[in-house]
């Protein structure tokens, strides 16, 4: 299981939101490049970026920081937030990102996911953010009636790199992951699932091992110091998330 540190970007700074609330922002660093380099130094094998401005408005405002981070790191970097067009996804990949994460468009324009997955096999991730099991979009502002697991099933066989399953209720709370929701997601999809939301301790990380997720995104716990990345990697063991091309001989 791969442990993936998160950097959430808001107006060029590293921040964390509490349960996705833009009115509950904690700023951790004004230098996202330095922070990214620190996670790499501690042993991270992948970095997760979120463009919170893009997620909320659909307009990219953190591209300079994203470019600087990808240029500075030797580990792969993935990004989500505001990726709502073919042109935007391709622009981000041209920055040197390893993967782009499609959230809102996965529900609103599923054909775009299919198009990008075919064009960039193993580099497209679907982000499914859920509140009480139902998908939320546009920076977690808009609630829908779509079941998270149903959306995951929609993209079976496309050769996605992964699904990032975020539980909004636990995100930024350090209260522990929603194991029930994660089990349901793993059972619903053959695509590798990356857990996101609620990690507060190394014990929380260990609780994910029997669930079968391929990775876990950790944010606030690293910044608050309740999880030390180097210690967590030693406790859990850090394996690189296999992309779809290596985990199966052909799309199912």
Swiss-Prot record:
Domain of life: Bacteria
Family matches, as Pfam families: His_biosynth
GO molecular function annotation: 1-(5-phosphoribosyl)-5-[(5-phosphoribosylamino)methylideneamino]imidazole-4-carboxamide isomerase activity
Coiled coil: none
Pathway: Amino-acid biosynthesis; L-histidine biosynthesis; L-histidine from 5-phospho-alpha-D-ribose 1-diphosphate: step 4/9
Recorded GO CC terms: cytoplasm
Record-listed E.C. numbers: 5.3.1.16
InterPro entries assigned: Aldolase_TIM, His_biosynth, HisA_bact_arch, Isoase_HisA-like, Isoase_HisA-like_bact, RibuloseP-bd_barrel
Major location category of this protein: cytoplasm
Compartments in which it is found: Cytoplasm
Active site annotation, chain numbering: 8 (proton acceptor), 129 (proton donor)
Keywords, sorted A to Z: Amino-acid biosynthesis, Cytoplasm, Histidine biosynthesis, Isomerase
Reactions catalysed: 1-(5-phospho-beta-D-ribosyl)-5-[(5-phospho-beta-D-ribosylamino)methylideneamino]imidazole-4-carboxamide = 5-[(5-phospho-1-deoxy-D-ribulos-1-ylimino)methylamino]-1-(5-phospho-beta-D-ribosyl)imidazole-4-carboxamide
Keyword Cell wall biogenesis/degradation attributed: no
One GO term (biological process): L-histidine biosynthetic process
Family: Belongs to the HisA/HisF family.
PANTHER family tied to this protein: 1-(5-PHOSPHORIBOSYL)-5-[(5-PHOSPHORIBOSYLAMINO)METHYLIDENEAMINO] IMIDAZOLE-4-CARBOXAMIDE ISOMERASE
Protein known as: 1-(5-phosphoribosyl)-5-[(5-phosphoribosylamino)methylideneamino] imidazole-4-carboxamide isomerase
Originating gene: hisA
């Amino acid at each position: 299981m791969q442990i993936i540190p998160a950097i959430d970007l808001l107006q060029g700074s590293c921040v964390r939101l509490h349960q996705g609330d833009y009115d509950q922002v904690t700023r951790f660093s004004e230098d996202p490049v330095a922070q990214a380099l620190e996670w790499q130094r501690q042993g991270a094998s992948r970095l997760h970026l979120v463009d919170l401005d893009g997620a909320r408005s659909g307009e990219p405002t953190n591209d300079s920081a994203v470019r600087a981070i990808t240029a500075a790191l030797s580990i792969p970097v993935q990004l989500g937030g505001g990726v709502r067009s073919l042109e935007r996804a391709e622009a981000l990949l041209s920055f040197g990102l390893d993967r782009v994460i499609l959230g809102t468009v996965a529900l609103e324009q599923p054909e775009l996911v299919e198009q990008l997955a075919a064009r960039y096999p193993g580099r497209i991730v679907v982000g499914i953010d859920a509140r009480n099991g139902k998908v939320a979009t546009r920076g977690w502002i808009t609630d829908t009636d779509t079941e998270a697991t149903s959306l995951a099933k929609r993209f079976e066989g496309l050769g996605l790199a992964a699904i990032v399953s975020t539980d909004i209720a636990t995100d930024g709370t350090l209260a522990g992951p929603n194991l029930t929701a994660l089990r349901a997601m793993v059972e619903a999809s053959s695509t590798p699932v990356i857990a996101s939301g609620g990690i507060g301790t190394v014990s929380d990380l260990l609780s994910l091992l029997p669930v079968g997720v391929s990775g876990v995104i950790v944010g606030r716990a690293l910044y608050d110091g309740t999880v030390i990345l180097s210690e967590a990697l030693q406790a859990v063991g850090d394996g690189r998330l296999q992309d779809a091309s290596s985990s199966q001989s052909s799309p199912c």
